[in-house]
Every structure is written in C-alpha cells, then in structure tokens.
Amino acid sequence: MGVKNLWDILESCKKKLPLHHLQNKKVCVDLSCWLVQMYSANRSPAFAKDKVYLKNLFHRIRALLALNCTLLFVTDGAIPSLKLATYRRRLGSISHAAKESDQPNSHPSISLRRNKGSEFSCMIKEAKRLGMALGIPCLDGLEEAEAQCASLDLESLCDGCFTSDSDAFLFGARTVYRDVFIGEGGYVICYEMEDIEKTLGFGRNSLISLAVLLGSDYSNGVNGFGPETACRLVKSVGDNLILDQILSNGVKATRKCKGKNSGNKVDDMCPKASSCEVGMTQDSDGQFRDVINAYLEPKCHSPDSEAVQRVCGQHPFLRPQLQKICEEYFDWSPEKTDQYILPKIAERELRRFSDLRSASSALGIKPLLSEIPVPCPVLAIVKQRKVHGNECYEVSWRNIEGLQVSVVPGDLVKSACPEKITEFLEKKGEEKKQKRRARPKKSGQAAVKDVDEQLQELLLGIEADSGGILGATASVCQTLTAAYTVAVEDVVDLSSPSPPLRKLSKSQKKMMAEDVNVAGMNMNKMESESSFSTQSSTSDVDNQLIDLSSPLAGGDNGMKGGRRALADISNVGSHSTETDGGGGGGGGVASVGHGTTIDLSSPSPAIGDRSRVHHDDDDVIHERKARDLRMFLDSIRNELY
C-alpha cells in the first residue's frame, strides 16, 4: 500500500511513457508487487492451477528482455516490527491488529519472519526459479523489498524501480514505475522524484511527513489530517524543516479560515493558528521518530555488500533449464518454449550490439562492421516485412542456437548494422534488373524461319509414317509458311472445315484426266492403284493467298484465270482413273481441272461410282495426321497474332 492517498497527491506528476522507454535500462523489480498484480486479475481456482499468473510473468519478462531491459528481482525479507499491525490486519486478524495499534512500539526491534510455506511464498519461489533460467538474478531483501529497490536506485546501481508501493519515494527512490503494459502500443506508468520536487515542491522529507500525518504501513496517521490539510501544512513549513518541526513541536491540524479572520489568511492558512486549531498531537512516546527513522534508515543490503555485487553482474540465459521449467509448469514442448523466447533473446543481443556501436560513435570511433571485435548477431537480411504498420526485417542469425530466422524492428537493424541493409538493397536491386531484362525479340523473318523449321520437322515425321499421302500435305504447309513471309491481308484458317463440294460437271470429270499443277503442289504417287504427275497448267493462275476456312469461288467451266485449287488429299488416292477417249493405254492419269475445290477438312463427295475406291485405313490415318497438323498450325497462328 505505502502512504495513504499519496498516489492521488502525485497524480499531476504521472507520466505515460512508451514501452520503448525501458530500452537498455536496468530496473529493480519488487517481485511481490508484480505477482500480486497478476494474481489479483483472476482469483479463480483454475487460474491458480494452470499457473496463469506465472505465464503472464513469463510474457512480461520476454517483452522487456527484447528491449535489452536488464531486470533484477527483489523479494521481501522479514516483516518490520512497525508493520506487524498492518500485516496482521491484511491477514484478517482484527484482534491482533487492535492490540498492535494500541501498543505500536511494544516490540520495536523485533521483526517477524515470513511463512516460507505459504501459498504466496511458493509463488515467489516459482517466479524466482523462472527468472534465474531467463538470466534474471534475485536479491532477497532483509526487510522491505521496495526499500532495497530504492536503495539501489539511490546509489545509481539501477535506473528505476518497479513497485506499486508509494513509500518507495520515502526510502529514497528517484524513479518509480508503477504499472507496465506489454504488447502493441505498450506503455509504462512512471513517476520521477525530480518532477515531484518541481511540480509539487515536495522532497523526500516532505513525503515522509505526509506519511506521518496521513498514515502508512508504519503508522495510522494523525486524526484530523486529510490530503489537502497535510499538504498545506508541509508546504507552509518547507522540506528542510518539516521533520524537525514534527519531532520537536508535534503537529496540529488546521482548517480554512472562516469569519473575521478569513481576510488575513495566507495560502489558506490562518496566521493565528490558535483561533483555527483543530487538534494538537505531540510525539510524547516517540512514535513519529520511529516512523521517520524507518524511512530514513531502512534495513537493507548495502551497495558494496557481497549479495548486491553478486546480483549486479551478468547472468547467462539457461535454455535447457527454461525448457524444463516451462514443460513442468505450462506443459509446453521445448520447441514451443524456443518459439517464444529465442527471438527475444536474439533481439536483445542485437540491441546490445547496437548499444556498443552507439557508445563507440559517441567517443568518435566509427569502425567498419568487419573491424568490430564483437561479431554482429545478424548474418543477413532475408526480406522486408510490415508488422502492425511498422517497418521490420526478417533476418538470419549468427550463433543463436536453435534459431535460424526471426523478425526484428527496422530501426533496430538500421542502428545496429546499416551495412546489412545496404547489402540487402543492392542484392534486391540486382534481382530486379535481371527480372526486367527482356529477352531479345526475334525479327519477323527469323520467327517465320523457326516456324518453317518446326513445320518441316513435323511433316518429315508424318511423311515417314504415312508415305506419299502426306507429301501433298507437306506441300500445303510449305505454301502456308511462305504465305507468312508475305505482307498480305488474307488469313489462313485451318480451324474451320471447308464447305461441301459442289457436284462436279462432266467437263470437270473430263478435265480430271489431265495432269494439272494444283496450288503449286506436286502430287506424287499416293497408292499403287492411282498415280498423279504434275504438269504446268496452260491457264493463268493467280498467285494469291488461299483462305482454307472460307469457300472458294464457284468452279464453273467459264471461270477466268481460275484460282489455284485446293486438293482434298484424303480422297485423291481413292479416285479410279478414267481412260482418255483417244487413248488406248492401260492406266489413265486422273487429274483435277481448273476451279475444282478439294476440301482438306472433310471427305470429298463421290465423284462417281465407277471412279471411287474406298480405303478406310488410309482415311483414318490421314484424318489423324491432318488433325495434328491443323492443331499445330493453329497454335502457331495464335502465337503470331
């Protein structure tokens, strides 16, 4: 508890600081206060059985370790004799408390040893064991833990005290952290003695006098004094004289002036104290002196004692012991324990390295990263990350057993090893350049040449399998390939079937007996029953690109200059030859006249019962090969357009 109403009096001096304020600081912790805070959050049996209070302590410690905040646990020793009444009252022993209040100094020099077997004492032992595994030493105080913390702070052996007892200032503490909240947006509640002196005008002696007047763990206070009255009295006397005034003349309560004396009051105090006097209390039995001495000369370890020197040194992190403790208390696997604590330990090592570089820079020494005798904990930066909107880096670690990579704040990496960031950004820039480097574009003729080579390879394989039937197909493909090199607007579409063939006229049937050059394609012998030879056509033929996906002009006999015909190579071999009217040879030559349309995608209609011979096997083979060819050409067309 401390001094009654003191936290309210000091409210104007309270500061809410970010958790980062504790970075690189050494702080003493009143362990009893921390455990009481965590245990009071939930008093259910399940809470105590699952040791949730100990888990909360673990997570609070790991958050502070990541900031390189060095902690020192301090526990209570024996109960001071002046505090026995308060202690028994807290335990609910009213009768003992009443007797103790009647005779406050009946045993002034005897302290009461604490019950080491109580539930709370067992909680303290568990916390001390957990702290030792995390590298946090513990100092067992002679009496009050807050008095020992204040003594270390007063001697500059630490940067502050964690305690919720307001009487830490009375023992000499300069900086007191009352509460701490971890996590995103974490902060700490801080009180500075310097602020109290400047803002309120209260020094250490003034605060001790407030304890005498208002009451504390050591006394019940003086009747008639409230916070406002006590503060007015202390301010009116001054910090240097207030204790002597209390010891020599006692204290008397006063009230605000009313009536005829109100016009002469100074700072709400009546200059004629006798006229406004409420009560007078003399220190006849030395009660005030005992309380004052308890605060001015507390029983605690001296700064140069062996116990203090032992805990002020460095203590290692004991990973195997921590894994065992967490498995025993929390039922955690070693891997889960490592997942919680190792990233924080690594971050602490990086902060220590950053602090080393900052100290060197302050001395005017700015060595390169490779010249520092202590190796940098960061091996390399893996990638950039964003955590709660803050810039962070995922880094790989050097010499951190059990930890490969973790995420650390970006500002920490910048202060500890900016060279690693430069190295990472340069590497990232090179990777982007390689990705942006475009492949050299091939010229149009080179692209067509590649297409032609692929077509030739495919058609050679097809010709080897199907013989002379696909010779004509190869000629078609060569014609199409040549067409790609000519800048024309016509498009070759092999994906749509040709329209149905019209019925052949007698003149067309007669013309089939002649040898004709069909679309510039030589049709060699396709089957043993029929053969075709190529001759130059006497008619003029237009060298135009042929659209295989749309029907050609009507193939009437009067067609001028007729276009190059498309041959349906799937049925050419099945036409029987017609004998020439003037010839008496054995095997006539079947030929195709001008303007005749021969479909590549569908079987040709019957030219005549006498001239058609079905070869089912050849049709199946050709259809399959033609389909493959169309699919390949379609893929090339999609790539080009």
From Swiss-Prot:
Its EC number is 3.1.-.-. Its main location: nucleus. Highly expressed in shoot apical meristem (SAM) and young leaves. Expressed in roots, flag leaf and panicles. It is an enzyme of class 3 (hydrolase). Mg(2+) 2 binds at residues 165, 167, 217. Coiled coil: none annotated. Residues 132-217 are annotated as: XPG-I domain. Its cofactor is Mg(2+). Induction: By the DNA-damaging agents methyl methanesulfonate (MMS), H(2)O(2) and UV. Down-regulated by sucrose starvation and the cell cycle inhibitors aphidicolin, hydroxyurea and colchicine. InterPro entries: 5-3_exonuclease_C_sf, HhH2, PIN-like_dom_sf, XPG-I_dom, XPG/Rad2, XPG_DNA_repair_N. Residues 1-90 are annotated as: N-domain. The keyword Phosphoprotein does not apply. Belongs to the XPG/RAD2 endonuclease family. GEN subfamily. This is Single-strand DNA endonuclease 1. It comes from Oryza sativa subsp. japonica (Rice). The gene is SEND1.
